[in-house]
Structures are given as structure tokens and as C-alpha cells.
Amino acid sequence: MAELSTPSPASPAPLDGGRGDELEKFTLRGARQILQLLQDLITHRGLITAHTGGGHSFMTAVLKVDEERGRVVLDPSPDPQANRRALAAPRLTCVTQLDGIRIQFPLVGLGEGQDKGRPALFAPLPAEMLRLQRREFYRLQVPLAHELSCLLKAEDLARKPVEVSARVIDIGAGGVAVVVPTGAAEFVIGGTLPACRLALPDGEPIELDLEVRNLNRQTQRNGTEQLRVGLRFAALPRAADTRIQRYIFKTERALNAKARGGL
């Protein structure tokens, strides 16, 4: 298998399918457009979060686009159980980012086999792909070197108060995604975590309320499992939005300069 970039757990959870009308204009259905976008994912060695349902996901990548056979070749998970879940799922929802643009597409009819003598997953080419860049959906993948964190005030499995220091993996105008060890706390979709503390590099932590929007267990490429928690900003203090946008802007500018060789 070709060398891949470092896995990023920042890929967001799938967008709500109930927002179809709102997302329709961002959906690609042309065969040429879909083939080109898949090829771009190969060229940029983009890591994909593949959601199998039931809150489970694993990291994968597009290895090849077989236009003649009308199929896409994916890298399997090192975890056999994750592969079994994927093969049994009626639908695989793939989510990634490419040059700051969110990409999401469904795969059905997943199968397994060999590609050039190595294990691989196969699926028919997707019928559509979502290509989205909008302020409310955009998420900055936080560089590992920044060590952005958020102190979550939640409850453990015994319903006792617990504080969990979570690593922030992506951040946007509307919320953050964090990763925590599985079993660190009891999170409920729709529940509110009050008085959490988001630490940004430019000052004191921001105290804010967070609403749990999605939960996904992720199997990393080394086989370990962690819980990804998607959180919406339920109540931001005054000027906090400006600080968050400033952090995103400065980080994007630094990353772009580095990519151009300016740093």
C-alpha cells in the first residue's frame, strides 16, 4: 500500500441526512466530477473516516479508482471486527476534508478481496458526493503541535460528576470535536455539558456550555479505539466567537505559508 499521511481523527461525523434540500446544491452526481474528486483524494493521500452505523467508524483511504470495473478500492482497517462491521453494514458513509473542503459520500455493496496481493475493500463507485465549504460547517483540523484542549464537565457511568480533559481535533464557528478515551465519561446525544473550559493559545480559557451532537467510536490505524464527541457551542460568552475565528484564521494562514515553503 502506498504511504499515507498521518491519520487525522478530525474528520467530522456525517451531516444529517434530513437536511437534503439545504445540501442539494453542494452534491455532485456527474460521473466525471466524482471520478476526479476520488482521484484527488488519492493524490493528496487523504485519510477518510468511514462510518458503519451504530456509532462505529474506522480510518481508511482510497487506494485506487477502477473506472473500467466501476468500483473504488479502499484500505481495510487493521481491526478485523471493524472490517466485519463494514461488510455487514448496508451503507458506509465516508467523511474527509480536502484543502479545507468537506467531502462526504456513501458507499453500498461493500466487498473484500485482494488488490496487488494485499487485502482490500471494494465498492461500486458512489452515485453522489457532497463537496461543501460553508462557514457554519467548516472545521479547522487542529495541528497536533497546538495541543488544543477542552475541559469537559460530565458524569461518569455511575452518574457522578467527572472532569475530562479532552483533546480538540477540529474547531469551527459552531462547535468543536474532541477525542477522549472510551469509558472516560457518559455522554448522551442532546445533553448539555455546562461550564466547560476551552483553552486557546491567545489567552485565558473560555468558559462555555456545550451540547453533545454526535458520538462515534473510532478505530485508529494502530488498532486502538477512542471516542469522538461532536459538540455544539450552546452558549458563548461575549467576544469568544471573535477569539475562535481569530485562532482559525491565524492557524490557516500559518499552515498555508508552511505549505508554500514560507515557514
From Swiss-Prot:
Oligomer status and interactors: Monomer. Interacts with the flagellar basal bodies.
User: Can you tell me which family this protein belongs to?
Assistant: Belongs to the YcgR family.
Chain intervals for the UniProt region annotation (Disordered): 1-21
Q: Which residues form the PilZ domain?
A: 133-250
Q: Which organism is it from?
A: Thauera aminoaromatica
The membrane-spanning stretches of this chain are none
Q: Name one GO biological process term.
A: bacterial-type flagellum-dependent cell motility
The protein's name is Flagellar brake protein YcgR
Q: Which GO terms describe its molecular function?
A: cyclic-di-GMP binding
Q: What is this protein's function per UniProt?
A: Acts as a flagellar brake, regulating swimming and swarming in a bis-(3'-5') cyclic diguanylic acid (c-di-GMP)-dependent manner. Binds 1 c-di-GMP dimer per subunit. Increasing levels of c-di-GMP lead to decreased motility.
